[in-house]
Amino acid sequence: MSEAPRIQLLSPRLANQIAAGEVVERPASVAKELLENSLDAGARRIDVEVEQGGVKLLRVRDDGRGIPADDLPLALARHATSKIRELEDLERVMSLGFRGEALASISSVARLTMTSRTADAGEAWQVETEGRDMQPRVQPAAHPVGTSVEVRDLFFNTPARRKFLRAEKTEFDHLQEVIKRLALARFDVAFHLRHNGKTIFALHEARDELARARRVGAVCGQAFLEQALPIEVERNGLHLWGWVGLPTFSRSQPDLQYFYVNGRMVRDKLVAHAVRQAYRDVLYNGRHPTFVLFFEVDPAVVDVNVHPTKHEVRFRDSRMVHDFLYGTLHRALGEVRPDDQLAPPGATSLTEPRPTGAAAGEFGPQGEMRLAESVLESPAARVGWSGGASSSGASSGYSAYTRPEAPPSLAEAGGAYKAYFAPLPAGEAPAALPESAQDIPPLGYALAQLKGIYILAENAHGLVLVDMHAAHERITYERLKVAMASEGLRGQPLLVPESIAVSEREADCAEEHSGWFQRLGFELQRLGPETLAIRQIPALLKQAEATQLVRDVIADLLEYGTSDRIQAHLNELLGTMACHGAVRANRRLTLPEMNALLRDMEITERSGQCNHGRPTWTQLGLDELDKLFLRGR
């Protein structure tokens, strides 16, 4: 029998190389650590030079505070940092780095040269080290105030790691993405990037709102900026601002999603869940939203020391953060109207949501979301178009489409859709557009119907095409949600209660949220440490698999502190009702009926998409029409 191996300390070199496996995955990982150090040093300009995707050379130069000569060797030691001193400092840390591991890890797998000079030093000093040589060499050098870090031959001494690197272009794309993320996080810093001697981009400082918008356009593309809604909301010590893409600007991959917590780029499942909920019924299946959002909160209530790469965070009150993010984004998307989508880029802004009663995201006494968390203000509260015309329709010629003060019941909203197409009074559909663009509603006036499916309309920008079934489906769907919110959810007691075997933790969760379940029409009773009984379910969900639904909801509550599964099931049912209740294809509409539908779209939330996420209308501008006919060439 062989002798058991003895426990022994790892050599510093091996320990650093093991640590490098967590911190240094590829050149982009090196760039992230070096750039964060530059930002923490107060840099106002950062130059990045790359060769062969960052494998052969990665040089980061900044104009920050610099490092004193005596501290240069220490900067390459493990767990050496200037950013925290005590454990209490970690609870309120605002710097991007604080572990003191990055430079030691990088120097263990590459040839590293660091040159730095402080403002009060007469000369710069340089330190060199290689993976095999853990004793840094310090010598004088020429360098302006600031720091340069040069990393050559990444993974030269760990060939097993090097062979996992991708092609040069792939590695450079990852590295460039890191710089873009940091460029969005710090508008006050200039970033310059060169690859193989060629300038890739030069981003100047962005101090004012217009300059910030330009940088967002440069990083994310001008198309995003033109299809994004600026938002800024602050409440209860939580501050969210940035840009959210309209549902019409979705992507097949989640590659245009930037979320920052106190200036730190994070990818958090709680944030992803809140955003997914907010876009739930306006995105087509398989599409992903786009956003650049900045979330600012007291550092004491967020833990950034969760993962070595610091990509994950943990919030002290995750439920409140989730509900704030969801409610803010849901309201912002709900308040988009056709005139917002036709406005010039950056013209629309949500500074504070309008009061919406039992609206999405409104907080109850204990910070819980109220019952109608996915229902926004009733369209019945906004009669006529808000473009400055008379609500009576006498002067505008299109605003005579009125509604009752009280929201309709579920039965009325689902079955009386024909009443929504009551013709306008004679003479109210103008034969031609008014001369003044101020008098033209966003979706214009109907011209004709195409194949019984599409409405052709003319507005101030050109031609509008509307899918009448999809548009009316959304209108009916929103009314059904409002009706359900006003009536409440009626429960249906089960003749024979269903028993569920759960874990003790799940049973505790269900008991803790019993009031929340009851407001949604469920009645749960705990029969034992690991047994629940379902005694009542929502009447609308009597055909649903109640046992599995309750299990899924409890799993969500344990994971995120909230759940939208019940609401999603209800919305799916309402969506089916709306689909069957909407005007069908091949039904001929009169011009007044078509205009009534257009006016209704202009005051209905999320009218740009049906509840399946398909677009309901599109605009063909005069310039696009001119291109089709080669006019002006």
Curated annotation (Swiss-Prot):
Region entry Disordered, spans: 336-364, 384-405
InterPro entries: DNA_mismatch_repair_CS, DNA_mismatch_repair_MutL, DNA_mismatch_S5_2-like, HATPase_C_sf, MutL/Mlh/PMS, MutL/Mlh/Pms-like, MutL_C, MutL_C_dimsub
Transmembrane segments annotated in the record for this chain: none
CDD domains in UniProt: HATPase_MutL-MLH-PMS-like (cd16926), MutL_Trans_MutL (cd03482)
Cross-referenced PROSITE patterns: DNA_MISMATCH_REPAIR_1
Keywords recorded for this protein, A-Z: DNA damage, DNA repair
Matches recorded under Pfam families: DNA_mis_repair, HATPase_c_3, MutL_C
GO biological process terms, semicolon-separated: mismatch repair
GO MF annotation list: ATP binding; ATP hydrolysis activity; ATP-dependent DNA damage sensor activity; mismatched DNA binding
Leader peptide range in chain numbering: none
Residue ranges, compositional bias (Low complexity): 388-401
Gene Ontology annotations for the cellular component aspect, listed alphabetically: mismatch repair complex
HAMAP family: DNA_mis_repair
Annotated family: Belongs to the DNA mismatch repair MutL/HexB family.
Function: This protein is involved in the repair of mismatches in DNA. It is required for dam-dependent methyl-directed DNA mismatch repair. May act as a 'molecular matchmaker', a protein that promotes the formation of a stable complex between two or more DNA-binding proteins in an ATP-dependent manner without itself being part of a final effector complex.
The protein's name in its UniProt record: DNA mismatch repair protein MutL
Organism phylogeny: Bacteria, Pseudomonadati, Pseudomonadota, Gammaproteobacteria, Pseudomonadales
Gene it is expressed from: mutL
